Amino acid sequence: MDSDMDYERPNVETIKCVVVGDNAVGKTRLICARACNATLTQYQLLATHVPTVWAIDQYRVCQEVLERSRDVVDDVSVSLRLWDTFGDHHKDRRFAYGRSDVVVLCFSIANPNSLHHVKTMWYPEIKHFCPRAPVILVGCQLDLRYADLEAVNRARRPLARPIKPNEILPPEKGREVAKELGIPYYETSVVAQFGIKDVFDNAIRAALISRRHLQFWKSHLRNVQRPLLQAPFLPPKPPPPIIVVPDPPSSSEECPAHLLEDPLCADVILVLQERVRIFAHKIYLSTSSSKFYDLFLMDLSEGELGGPSGSGGPRPEDHRSHPEQHHHHHHHHHGRDFLLRAASFDVCESVDEAGGSGPAGLRASTSDGILRGNGTGYLPGRGRVLSSWSRAFVSIQEEMAEDPLTFKSRLMVVVKMDNSIQPGPFRAVLKYLYTGELGENERDLMHIAHIAELLEVFDLRMMVANILNNEAFMNQEITKAFHVRRTNRVKECLAKGTFSDVTFILDDGTISAHKPLLISSCDWMAAMFGGPFVESSTREVVFPYTSKSCMRAVLEYLYTGMFTSSPDLDDMKLIVLANRLCLPHLVALTEQYTVTGLMEATQMMVDIDGDVLVFLELAQFHCAYQLADWCLHHICTNYNNVCRKFPRDMKAMSPENQEYFEKHRWPPVWYLKEEDHYQRARKEREKEDYLHLRRQPKRRWLFWNSPSSPSSSAAGSASPSSSSSAVV
């Protein structure tokens, strides 16, 4: 349909609306939002400003734009033609003003100068070129009033002048100027899609009312209302901050390996070939090898270990006191074939190898002779001869030994290994027991497999076989399984206090722990136990202001890398303890757990306002900044309710928090003021409309009285002046 037909259609009012204002206030965006239904994001609007003008030819060349120009306002069919202008082309604007029905005067709420120019330049210019056209004042870019200005300024072009918070104009500033000029005032946001219809519908009303005064015979213009009031815009409720848990520390394998090289708090001495002494830790060896686990649980108070047949076994303190017997048959195969035998890492029972011999090619004959010659025996003090119990060990005993780092004598467990075990391959085995890894470039793989056979570490044998078969990639799954199983054993040792070497004295009791595990997973613990402090040489450490539930949660995290909650766990006390121990990852996990609990309580209609107030300042003081941000968000979005229930607590908040509340509270203060003004103005408008209706005459006259009878026509001819006494 040709656009000229709108001018010829009966009862269709064509409205020419000219949009003027300073550069970059949002005129063209506003026109496109109405004419083309264009939607833009805030970042698109913040792109480099290029002066543009929306061509009036769009109504002729684009059918969609023409269709969207048609509207019905107060039962009047209209066709709205929008005219865009440049903000700085003075000569071109006078042609746009010609025969305009209404003028929309725009300014930006983030640019006070644009509002100042409304009074000093734009309104006088409008009245000069089209003195009878009504004017509508529009505040654009409303979304900047509640936006994050720091993010907005970062997204703008580099040389753009930053938007300052004190430059954001409140609604009353625009309303004051509009009242001074005697024109309606509206606000819009293309980003929020707010106020666009209000502006142009009321601009149409203003144009139709102005036209009604000149074309008073058009009856369809009688019911056109004056420009309506605009309800204030309620900004969207800000979403709660998301608790981000950073990646856990990546030194889970490096620290144990370093602990093996630098044996801090070592409690085991492994003697190889009567001359090589290697310091190690019970907790690492026992949680990685079932053989070491049974060895360290052995009762050393009895000097004799069974009879020559090996029927008398060790007496561990747990359920392993009756080990299952495993017998290996002799096969004359190549060493690599031996490595490919089925193996399982989860072998927890000891193996009776008495009277047996290892596979040919992997075990030296001299070592076999030594083992067969040593049946059972006695050691002075607390110790045992282990020849008939395991082919890997010769004896175990407790003795005073010099610490390799502090050079102080203390009680240690000395384990003499079989003479066939060489130091180099044995260190590779120890590295596996500490880290679960075996290097592909390790030498003496056959000796490593031999030691793994003696210690019954069958997964290590499988890793060696994979390397020999060029299938080392399969060792990753074995390493994962190693860590899973050791984690379970470490948790068991923590629960039972097995192999513990330190006791924490807490407010409500004591809890046993293991220094090597603490040192390898916490720098704070490493400094305490490895530095020149009293705690490094004592078995009891006092932890004031700490409960057993919090310390147990910290120990489980340090041992396993996982956070485990319990019913009696106090979230804030755990955050305080984790912050004291310099564990930011645990702090983040506890923050996430706390926020999840608060949100679940909110969904169950439980009042959490009091808890949030308590959490806020504690979280800020103890570096739980994500929890503090969440608490700030909750208080800001429930500000009125919190103030009503806890007025004293809110007044006792720090000045920084109170300033934050005033700046970020929702609904914001300007909205509450606007809502109050809108309600008062609406009541006044209703009262004015009521009084206006009462003043209207009950009887309306037409321009002439149609004669219904001869007498009436005679009366009409007798008094001709009665025909001109009508009221419209």
Swiss-Prot record:
GO biological process, alphabetically ordered: small GTPase-mediated signal transduction
UniProt entry tagged with the keyword Nucleotide-binding: yes
Composition skew (Low complexity), residue ranges: 706-728
Composition-biased stretches (Basic and acidic residues): 315-324
Stretch list, region Rho-like: 1-210
Key words, A-Z: GTP-binding, Nucleotide-binding, Repeat, Ubl conjugation, Ubl conjugation pathway
Region (Disordered): 304-333, 703-728
Record has Ubl conjugation as a keyword: yes
One Pfam family per UniProt: Ras
Stretches with biased composition (Gly residues): 304-313
Domain BTB: 266-333, 500-567
Residues holding GTP: 21-28, 84-88, 140-143
Gene3D superfamilies assigned to the protein according to its UniProt record, in alphabetical order: P-loop containing nucleotide triphosphate hydrolases (3.40.50.300), Potassium Channel Kv1.1, Chain A (3.30.710.10)
SMART domains in UniProt: BTB (SM00225), RAB (SM00175), RAS (SM00173), RHO (SM00174)
Post-translational modification: Autoubiquitinated by RHOBTB2-CUL3-RBX1 ubiquitin ligase complex.
Function noted in UniProt: Regulator of cell proliferation and apoptosis. It likely functions as a substrate-adapter that recruits key substrates, e.g. MSI2, to CUL3-based ubiquitin ligase complexes for degradation. Required for MSI2 ubiquitination and degradation.
Subunit structure: Interacts with HSP90AA1 and HSP90AB1. Forms a complex with CUL3 and RBX1. Interacts (via BTB 1 domain) with CUL3. Interacts with MSI2.
The name this protein goes by in its record: Rho-related BTB domain-containing protein 2
Species this protein is from: Mus musculus
Gene field: Rhobtb2
